[in-house]
Amino acid sequence: MSNARREFLLELENVKGSVGLEIGPLNKPLVKKEELESNGEIFYLDHLSTEELQEKYKDEASVKKDEIVSIDFVCRDGDLLKATSGHTFDYVVASHMIEHAPNLLLFLSEVHNILKPGGTCVLIIPDKRFTFDINRPVSTFGSVLENFLSKATYPSISAVYDHSAMAINANGHNLWYGIVNADDTRLLASENIGWEAAHRVHKEGHYYDVHVNIFMPE
């Protein structure tokens, strides 16, 4: 995240002097403990413990294992209130997280449960026009509602298939400046892979970590 964006976030709602929760900081937290004032506090939550995250990303070149932050709360089932032991916060922040949420409405409801009255939820969301999702349709409220009413706990068949069949090897910098190279349009997977993955979701409930919710500013 650019310094300008981090500075904007830190000034928002007096983050430096408030008690907050950051979801999914990994090795690049938006709010750093050392930047807070004496009355400010930040807690970190993820779906795995610090040690489990270090093991998961040990072979991932883009993630520096020794920089993964110390996780305060682990939430494996989506119940944020239970995971945080009933704590409430002045603000909750998450970057590039809700596009992965199998059940977006439930997640937002869970965030509401852990916010103090008048609290703030800050979400940093990718614009599909500048990501590998550029060819995918924007999510409708109908699809979001379906995931909520069906109590989805893993990415839907349609999300898994669409990712395989449409996601491209996009360079965000190129897309931002309107530059399109041949390699930027190459599919990350294929329709055949999408078909196989969709069947695995249907038969086994397999969890594929893909973008479920696709956004544009409008």
Stretches found by the model and what they are:
Residues 1-4, 103, 215-216:
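Soluble or luminal CAZymes and related metallo-dependent hydrolases
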Residues 62-75, 106, 112-116, 120-218:
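S-adenosyl-L-methionine-dependent methyltransferase catalytic module, highlighting the catalytic core
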Residues 18-134:
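Conserved SAM-binding loop
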Residues 13, 96-100, 209-217:
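Aromatic-acidic/polar surface patches that form glycan- and anion
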Residues 6-10, 81, 145-146:
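Generic detector of well-ordered alpha-helical segments enriched in charged/polar residues
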Residues 6, 28, 201:
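Residue-level detector of functional hotspots within protein domains
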Residues 1-17:
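Class I SAM-dependent methyltransferase Rossmann-like catalytic core
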Residues 3, 91, 203-204:
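General secondary-structure edge motif
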